C-alpha cells in the first residue's frame, strides 16, 4: 500500500483530467433520483444544461488521462502477495425505443433472458477481492446491424484486443473469464502470451483425458459420485493442455448443476480452482451497480462518442464509490454510494472546494 505522501502526489496528478463540467456530471450521478441524463443532472446541481453537456466535449480530450487514472489505481492496490485478477465480460445497455445510433443492435440480455435492442460493450476490469477497478471498454455491434464502414469484430476479438492492450500495463495473477471464452482460439491466444487463466467451459466441448475423447458432461473421469462436489483432471482440449475441474453446485429451484472450469494454474486443489474462477463475479456486480445506481442505461444522446463519455463517467463514479468503501470501511458499494450522496447533499451550498476530501479524482 502507498504512503500518505504517495497518495497526495497521486491525487494532485489525477485532478488534471476532471474539469468543472465533468465534476458536475459525476456529482449528479450520485445525487440524481430516477433517470440520470444531462437535464436531470443540471436540475439537481443547479447549473445550466450547457455546463453539464460540455462534459462530453471535455472527455474527448481526456480519454487517455482517465484510463491512466484507472491503471494507476491498480498499481496502488496491487501487492506482491495479491497482484489481483484480470476480468473481461460483456454487458448490454438496453435501448428498447432508440432508433438513431450506429451502436444499436440486437443481442442477448443475460438479466432478461431474451434478445433485446440496445448497445453492447465488452469491459475489462481488475479486482483484488476488496475493490473493483474498471480499465477499458469497447463496443460490439452485430454484423447485420452495422450501418457504417466499421469492420465487424466478434466479442472474443474485442476481448483479446483489450487484454493485449492492458496485459503489460497492470499486474495480475491470472485472467478469470466466462464460458463465452472457452474456445480453442482464445486459449491459444492466452498461451501465446503466457497468461494464466481460469475459464468456464460449456459442457458440450470435447476433451481428452487418459486417452478417452468425450464431451465434458459425459466423460467418465469427471463423473461426480454421491456427495462429491469437486473433481480435477489433467487433459487436452483441441490439443491444448489444460487442467479440467468439475464442480457440482446449487442451481435454480433447489437443483444441482455441474459446471466445468479449465485452467493452466498449477499447484491448486480442485476447490481452490473453483474459488479462483469465482473471482470473476465482481465484474457482474459492477454491471448491476452501474445500471441500478448510476444510470448506465439512461444516456439519451445519439452520437457514439456521447455514449462512450456517459459510460466512462459512470465507471468513474463507480470507482470513486469503491475507493470510498475501502477508505471508510463500508461493507458494500451500495452503502458507500448512500454515504457519498448524503455527504454531497449536506454540502450542496458550500462550494466545490469541499468535494476535494470526498473524491480521489477531484
PLM features: residue spans?
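Short, basic interhelical loop/turn and adjoining N-cap
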Residues: 43-55
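Active-site-proximal, Lys/Arg-enriched surface segment
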Residues: 57-131
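Single, function-defining residue in the core of a domain
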Residues: 1-10, 14-18, 22-27, 32, ...
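Short linear loop/turn motifs
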Residues: 53-59, 305
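Residues within the helices of the helix-turn-helix
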Residues: 39
Amino acid at each position: 500500500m502507498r504512503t500518505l505522501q504517495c497518495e497526495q502526489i497521486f491525487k494532485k496528478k489525477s485532478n488534471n483530467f476532471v474539469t468543472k463540467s465533468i465534476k458536475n456530471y459525476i456529482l449528479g450521478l450520485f445525487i440524481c433520483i430516477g433517470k440520470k441524463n444531462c437535464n436531470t443532472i443540471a436540475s439537481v446541481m443547479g447549473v445550466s444544461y450547457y455546463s453539464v453537456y460540455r462534459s462530453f466535449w471535455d472527455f474527448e480530450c481526456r480519454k487517455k488521462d482517465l484510463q491512466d487514472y484507472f491503471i494507476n489505481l491498480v498499481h496502488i492496490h496491487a501487492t506482491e502477495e495479491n497482484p489481483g485478477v484480470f476480468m473481461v465480460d460483456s454487458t448490454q445497455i438496453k435501448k428498447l425505443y432508440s432508433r438513431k445510433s450506429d451502436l444499436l443492435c440486437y443481442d442477448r440480455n443475460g438479466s432478461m433472458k431474451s434478445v433485446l435492442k440496445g448497445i453492447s460493450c465488452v469491459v475489462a476490469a481488475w479486482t483484488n477481492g476488496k475493490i473493483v477497478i474498471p480499465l477499458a471498454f469497447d463496443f460490439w455491434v452485430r454484423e447485420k446491424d452495422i450501418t457504417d464502414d466499421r469492420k465487424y469484430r466478434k466479442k472474443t476479438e474485442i476481448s483479446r484486443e483489450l487484454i493485449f492492450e492492458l496485459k503489460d500495463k497492470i499486474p495480475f495473477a491470472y485472467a478469470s473469464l466466462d464460458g463465452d471464452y472457452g474456445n480453442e482460439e482464445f486459449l491459444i491466444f492466452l498461451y501465446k502470451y503466457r497468461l494464466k487463466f481460469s475459464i468456464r467451459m460449456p459442457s458440450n466441448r470435447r476433451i481428452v483425458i487418459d486417452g478417452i475423447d468425450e464431451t465434458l458432461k459425459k466423460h467418465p473421469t469427471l463423473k461426480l459420485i454421491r456427495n462429491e462436489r469437486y473433481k480435477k483432471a489433467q487433459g487436452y482440449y483441441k490439443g491444448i493442455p489444460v487442467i479440467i475441474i468439475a464442480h457440482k453446485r446449487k442451481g435454480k429451484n433447489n437443483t444441482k448443476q455441474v459446471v466445468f472450469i479449465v485452467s493452466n494454474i498449477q499447484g491448486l486443489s480442485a476447490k481452490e480452482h473453483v474459488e479462483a474462477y469465482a473471482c470473476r463475479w465482481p465484474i457482474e456486480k459492477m454491471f448491476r451497480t452501474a445500471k441500478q445506481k448510476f444510470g448506465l442505461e439512461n444516456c439519451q444522446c445519439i452520437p457514439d462518442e456521447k455514449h462512450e463519455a456517459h459510460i466512462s463517467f459512470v465507471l468513474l463514479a463507480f470507482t470513486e464509490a469503491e475507493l470510498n468503501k475501502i477508505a471508510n470501511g463500508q461493507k458494500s458499494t451500495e452503502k458507500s454510494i448512500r454515504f457519498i450522496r448524503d455527504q454531497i447533499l449536506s454540502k450542496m451550498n458550500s462550494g466545490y472546494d469541499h468535494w476535494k476530501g470526498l473524491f480521489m479524482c477531484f
